[in-house]
Amino acid sequence: MGGLGNQLYQLAYADFLRRTYGYHCCIVNDWGIEKADTLGRDRVVRSLFTDIIKHCQFYYISPELGLQWSVYCRTKPFLRYFEEEQSKNAVYLSKNESRFSSFPPLAQKPRLFLPFVYRISGYFQSYKYTSLEFRNKIREFLEGIVSLPTTLEGIASGLTERSVAIHFRRGDFLKHPEIYKIFGAEHYLRGLNLLAGNKDIDKVYVFSDDFDAIESDLEIISQQYNLVRVEGGTVYEDLYLFSRFKRYVLAGSTFSWWGAFCSQYSDDIEVVVPRYPLKRSTSEDTFFPPHWIQLEEIDKISN
């Protein structure tokens, strides 16, 4: 299921199925992961944010629900199972006349199956599932639940339309180099210089899950820009604060992408991202909307 960013993509896909086809979607906690400690500040934890599921008005089934879980487990062998291909988690499943056209490939079809009930698994990291209505709903949720501590409220009150948010993801990215790219100071400077060419930058606000790991990158960037570290917030506080910006330079973190998706400025924002954020990215990917600025890698430009 992943962290909050991945969970929001999965909810956006469920919302897409509900809006487009009228499906009644239920979020199933097959992973058995614990409900999130929304006051926690540990970025390593990958918990389930059930309060957002409830806010989006989806049904939810988990092992602790007893009878409902028992019914699901008995029914599960008789459900057709559709599973997203590992290399296609950002490829939009276009809709057409068939009610299965927006489903990933069929992975299991029991000889006896229940009609009109399906099990679907995947990440669905395409901007095309993220409707404006859904993004507004997530922002409204954050605005209703978050009360910033004094230090972060001071940061929020100092933001202007010239401010820029940047986000460094390290943590589990460093543990899985076969999947994730690590973007350093060079990527962020390219993005910042691009934004500065359009409008001056007053301050650059830095978000990260591991500031110790990016000290050398920040030292390089600070030679050109005035940096402000955003530290000490919960996951919700960081995402809420991230949504208060109008300008962003981002890398491979879905958490940061959702901060931009939920910006209070809606689509009237400037966002710089890498064209290929993952090592297994493809030309078919639809991570980012077309108005976001996508940077090619330096070696591809030189070639």
Model regions: which residues?
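Short amphipathic alpha-helix
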Residues: Q10-L17
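Short, flexible loop/turn elements at secondary-structure junctions
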Residues: G2-G3, W31, F124, R170-D172, ...
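A short beta-strand-loop structural module common to alpha/beta enzyme folds
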Residues: Y23-E34
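Donor-binding and catalytic core of enzymes assembling or modifying cell-surface/extracellular glycoconjugates
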Residues: L4, N193-S281, F287
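Secretory-pathway luminal glycosyltransferase catalytic domains
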Residues: T38-D200
